[in-house]
Amino acid sequence: MISIDLALKYTPLPISVQRKEVEDAQTLYNQIVNAMKSGTSQLIELTCEKQTEKKVAVMSDQISAVILSQKDGGAAAGRVPGFFSMVESEQ
């Protein structure tokens, strides 16, 4: 699975969708980047090939980053490559 993660302005958690094929993921990545480059705000509707009932729509001017990455089977669920969290526990 190839994961496409969107970082949105003023939102701490990314939005993720998956594609089965690298070519499909690259095409979606390019569409999102082109929408971000355009001077006008566009509605981008995304679906997920892993969770077929998952749908999301975002405005292109609210996207601050798009990340394309190979999703490894051993990776922890909910963790996006390139991002990490440091939590200090109180005892």
UniProtKB/Swiss-Prot annotation:
InterPro entries for this protein: UPF0367
The record's family statement is: Belongs to the UPF0367 family.
Supply the name of the protein.
UPF0367 protein cce_2199
Annotated organism of origin: Crocosphaera subtropica (strain ATCC 51142 / BH68)
